[in-house]
């Protein structure tokens, strides 16, 4: 097994020069601890590692946080800090007294904006970052370049990265992006995901919500996976899992909190009044989707009924990972109105809206971009659009609408 360098490494070291605390969140097994422990060796400051997965250590952190910090003195790496939110107030006191950059590195398996106590206690004192499973650019060793529709940037990137065909893209989709699988540490993919669900996900759901029926929860997360890249339908999910809608909503919130799924919200404003309000649901790791929906090989997934949804999930998650890895907030939306006009992704930035369509075709037709015109009604300017597809080379319909191979994202 070899360590796969993460795009976030330099960002962590850079922020550690100005922030006393860094909180890195993300799903379990996404590589947070591995990366930070590798960086600890690199910085060579004698940073101690302590995990709150250990029940004795967790008990001290919760019930006597002052003693915990006396024993585990900074610089320190505290793993799974969400188990002891009581620490945050004492970390704040230490930061205010000492002002030492890089004193506290922390990881958490709950998305930071949903974690109890962080915003109240450490506001302005902590750098908040999110780590997803590996991006395809990390896997192939490419630079961290968040996706853009800037033609010059895209042309330059397409020269640096070796093109791949559709079967290779679906091999990446099916294999997934969890470091343990990609690095070769775990050879049996099915066993890995089975253990991942029972050892980590179900346990964390139980920790957050109390009791949980494992069978019904497995039905539920499978139903979510079967509807990836679709509008979030609580009623259908509840029906499939034989639970009530209140529980379905709670479990969706928990999966989002754990970094298993993310929601893409619709773009709307006062002018575009006919847009729908329901978000779409995606997984950070398409390998988990393929496991849950029982696609036995990349070839079957590529030819199956879900191939379009899998490709869309992969593409949207890759765009999101690129921005997260650069420590930048991604402003991503989709568009759908009551007249059935739809745009898969809208990127907002610099006063412009850049529309993106995702297609499983190597020969995109210009008619695909006809819906981009709905953005003209928005107060923001229509930026350069793109069709993200299986084309082997970069191209363009015209100056304002590009053709971008998905391998280059």
Predicted regions and their residues:
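Domain-level recognition of nuclease-like catalytic cores that cleave nucleotide substrates
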Residues: 391-409
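Hydrophobic positions on the alpha1 helix immediately C-terminal to the Walker A/P-loop
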Residues: 35, 39
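Conserved catalytic/switch belt of AAA+ P-loop NTPases
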Residues: 88-112, 119-121
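Conserved lysine of the Walker
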Residues: 32
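Hydrophobic anchor at the beta1->P-loop junction of P-loop NTPases
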Residues: 24
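Interdomain motor-coupling "hinge/lid" segment immediately C-terminal to the ATP-binding subdomain
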Residues: 111, 116-226, 230
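Accessory nucleic acid-recognition modules appended to NTPase machines
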Residues: 182-353
